[in-house]
Amino acid sequence: MDPMEYIVPNRKRLPYGMMNFAVIRREDYYYVDKTRFIPMIEQADRFFFFIRPRRFGKSLTLNVLQHYYDVRTRDKFNDLFGDLYIGKHPTANRNSYLVLYLNFSGITGELNDYRKGLDAHCSITFMNFCKRYADLLPPETLEELRQVNGAVEQLDYLYQACERAGQKMYLFIDEYDHFTNAILSDAKSLHRYTDETHGEGYLRAFFNKVKAGTYSSIERCFITGVSPVTMDDLTSGFNIGTNYSLTPQFNQMMGFTEEEVREMLTYYSCLLYTSPSPRDMR
């Protein structure tokens, strides 16, 4: 049987695997509105940890927040959010930050030499940040950044540049535990886990620098990953954030509820047999 027989024509496409909120909205993909959680996030700790398994929408959630808070997307607010919850109930902080987004899952390189990968990834990201906000930062920022070596030192320089310009930053880190999960999956490298997350480890040093930014130009920070293990071991290095992964009020922020799935199936007129839920069988 043709799978298309299960779908009524002229319906919105499903954004499977997509993480670009602007494209989803601009090209009218099906989108489950989770923006009601934005005011709740603002009421929570300024430094927000959230752990969920893979394929739960973590990256898309961060992308939504980036578009909401970025000063560069102010003129697109109505197009992106106008008919969503947050478009009808905007907060005072919308489109008010310089946004720095780091995705550690995109770092390539050999496991035993990940520091070069981290440095390279951060260097490119930091330079793009300087170009994106060139008119809001001191004019020498990009050229001076190029003279600084290493992710930790470059991040420190960005703090100084933002502080000199009187700008506040919203830092997003996606898959913060990418390195350590890779280390833990390799029995030959297990000893390196302690080396990197304790003492003078490079990853620990990086998160210590993130912590330092919270006293200067980082106004808010949102960090996601798939495991709490690394976070626990880095806690003393980044001990001002709050883990909201098990907080009931945020349970529905990522992933789909049963009601949302049923609504989606109804929208697509799926003629699929679904076994009754325990509630229906009572």
Task: Indicate where each model-derived feature is located.
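Single conserved hydrophobic/aromatic residue that forms the stacking wall/gate
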Residues: 273-282
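P-loop NTPase motor core
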Residues: 80-127
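Structural recognition of the conserved hydrophobic beta-strand(s) that form the central parallel beta-sheet
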Residues: 172, 220-226
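Short regulatory helix/loop adjacent to the ATP-binding pocket of P-loop NTPases
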Residues: 230-244
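Substrate-engagement module of ASCE P-loop NTPases
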Residues: 158, 162, 192-218
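Conserved small helical "lid"/interfacial subdomain of P-loop NTPases
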Residues: 250-272
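Conserved P-loop NTPase "ATPase switch" module shared by AAA+ and STAND
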Residues: 167-190
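Walker A/P-loop-proximal flanking segment of P-loop NTPase domains
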Residues: 3-69, 73, 78-87
